[in-house]
Each structure stands twice: as C-alpha cells, then as structure tokens.
Amino acid sequence: MRRRDFVKVILGSAAGWPLAVRAQQGERVRRVAVLSSAGSIDTSDPETQANVTAFVEALQHLGWASGRNLRIDHRVGGNNVERIRKLAEELVALAPDVILTAGATSVAPLLQATRSTPVVFVNVADPVGAGYAESLARPGRNATGFMSLGTI
C-alpha cells in the first residue's frame, strides 16, 4: 500500500469514528409519568400492581422496555386532592415525554402544572364539560384521552 493511500484510510477512519460511536449508543430513554388519582398510595397494592403490570406488558408488546428505552414514574394520589396536586407538580418537574392519568381528579392539577407536556387521561366522563378539551374531535391543548361511557 502506498503511503498516500495509507494516510487516506487513516484520515477516513478518524473522520467516520464519531459516527460509528454515535450509532453504537443506545436509543434515547423515553420517560412516561403515571398519576393515578384513586387507589391505595401503597404501590404494592394488588389492584395497583395489576394495573401497572397490564400497562407495562402492553408497552412491551409495542417494543418499549423499562431500562432499555423506557422509564416509568408512577405515583398514586389516594383520592387526596392536595396530594394529587403535589404529585402532579413533582411529575411535571421530572420532564416526562408524556403523562398518563387515571381519573378526573388528577387531570386539572396536571393541566395547571404543564401546558406543554402531553397529558393522556382515562376514565373521564365529560372532558369537554370539565374544560380539559375544547371538543372531542380536537382537544385544542396538551390533553387528550378516553371518556367513560356509563350505561343508562
């Protein structure tokens, strides 16, 4: 190999090295915050554990794995409005990529704590009437979710 060819190979390798290192780094870890308004504040409670397990398994089925590309921060308000407000502020301070909340009691404190982080709610009877969304077709803010439809 000629000296010039050798130098080209070395310089080319040196220039491409940062790209190779970047490619070897793992995926960005996404952070999901979960705020449950009801239930036991003991996260080892069987019902709470069953709900969390179902959520984690569904995410794993979609390719998300805790410790690899996902971190879940879970808090339970225990039906205490002041505790829920503090937990909402605490979770928003962690800068999650998205916040999931179960129960109408926790939606308002989350929407007061952030105007940019997406908030996904479940078990809310009337999100438009409660002011969480402008309409069912277009929420118009950082909140979206699923309504509870009871039987009459």
Language model features: what each stretch is:
Residues 1-152:
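Short hydrophobic alpha-helices and adjacent helix-cap/hinge residues
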